[in-house]
Amino acid sequence: MTPPTRMGPALLLLFFACISWSLAGAAAPVYDTAEVVLHSAQTFDGNSGTPNPFTSVTLTLTVVAPDGRTFQVDGFFDGNGAGGAVGDVFKARIFLDQPGTWSWTSSSATSGLDGRSGQIPCSGTLPGLFAKGPVVVPAATPRYFGHADGTPVLLLGKMLDFDAPPAQFTTFTFFSETFSESERRAELDYQHSLRVNTMAIYLFNQNDFNDDGPRPTNPWVGGDRTRFDLAHWRTFETWTRTLRDEGMVAQLWFFADDSGVGGFSMADRLRLIRYGMARLSAYANTMFVTTLEWEEAFTASEVDQAGQYLQSFNPWRRLTSVHGLPGLFDFPNASWANYMDLQIGILDDWDGNHQDALENRALAAKPSFCQEFAQGYESGFSRIKAWSVFFAGQAGVGSGAYLAWLAEFARTVPFQRMAPADSRVVSGDAYCMAESGVQYVVYFPLGGTALVDLSGASGTLDAQWFDPRTGQWSSAGTVSGGGTVSFTSPQGDDDMALWLRPPSGSAPPPVLGVAFTGRTGFDWSDTRDATSYDVVRGDLAVLRAQRTFTPAVNACLENNGTDRHAEDPVTPASGQGFWYLVRGVSASAGPGSYSIGDAGERPGRDPEIGASSAACP
């Protein structure tokens, strides 16, 4: 791992930002959404007549963040501003990812909208889960998701739930105009009861999931795809905010399958994408999928066009993907696809799902979200499928059963440090993931006995069983690393998971998720067994010239600091730079390592740093 760096004024500054919104001059918290409201000189009718405000008016804000970053933000027509079609209201939304004063200037060829400007103060913390920031792909763990503050997250959803009442067969129809507000409230409460954190929702659907009657979601005014139904969009955004405030990711899908999208012009498709991004992407909890089963309505080149177009109107860098028919993800190397949204054999057994998920994960070093692989029946079969997919190193699991206990397991076990390691299972029916030489998790789909190769580990490992049916942990004693060990499930032929980890008295593992939060400060991920942290700073030019850390270390910024944040008020000289490294410290076992064990790291980092008189003691 290359140490995180902070450069002088002439060079690049690497950081993560924080965002918020304000209203009537009040400061908005970090990661909230600010809304700029402008009024045109002319009144427009969004439902009929000319000119059509959705096709004839363009509004762009140039937004400057407190640290100087500049964003081009698309505005949108919003009728009377409250869901009515007739009015002079145009809006633009700003994702405030950094405390301080944000400024904006408008440009438009439409009278009343051009040359306006303002400022938005941002301070404080957004309540709830998204105080951690939006879901991103952390540089330190590129195959998994995390929040912007470095906290790892396994996305869990129940997109299909055929055991539920008809109105709750799927989350996709959540925005349908056929549902009442109370029905939507009941559906969200039901999702909370499952302890999932992600809902897949259509922005357009005509015929999908209509077995109990039509469940359309129409973003347009009737069949006129040049005009948007502003009352419907007000519902979309209101519930998107509600999901955010209640800790739920809104994974928004522009187009459903089985809905005639193949007959739409590309201009109509792109218009929906642009309008949807303008209205919804500034909310911290949003992610996007262009279409379900793209092969039914798009060519491969049209998918590429749509993905690139979406990213051109994605100033807040929301994650996006596309969903195909069962099989391999078709666009693993596309720059617009931030993650791979998968459909694998929905009627296959769990081992088929596991192998398919592994094959897809190997396509690219980006998150693989196994979305569609089970019908969601609350059965042992669906549960085993979900765990088998998770043990293929998936960053998200979109269906399955007993998901509350998979969520509990993922919150406890640092899965983001692990990779699939089925080769560690010498014999027996089991799957394995490992942080090589440190810790292992093993899943027994049918219980039984498995022989596991622990030759990469040394010393004693604590062993704990986890019951996927009840969420209960139980001790399996200790085992010794350095060889093969046999494990037998305590629940006969029922599925069980096993966690093998260093004893709690061991030194903490490497610190991950180091990310700048401004020009002078940076955070890092919570690290198992660390009760405090040491942070060292060094001179980048000296490290490059002498190729050793000892002479390059110039400060211990924190020694046994108890938070996960460090500030450095010293600015490098122009053309120069600093590097930073963090290690966890255990109250009982002492300090961990400044190294994270990447293959590209040369050995000796810790003793070299320790030999410097400027290093932390």
Regions found by a protein language model. Give the residues of each.
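Active-site mouth of glycoside hydrolases
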Residues: 58, 129-339, 344-349
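Short beta-strand elements bearing conserved aromatic residues within extracellular beta-rich modules
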Residues: 59, 461, 533-535, 580
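Extended acidic/polar, glycine-enriched regions
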Residues: 69-71, 75-140
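Beta-strand-rich modules
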Residues: 531-532, 571-592
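Recognizes extended acidic, P/S/T-rich segments that occur
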Residues: 534-575
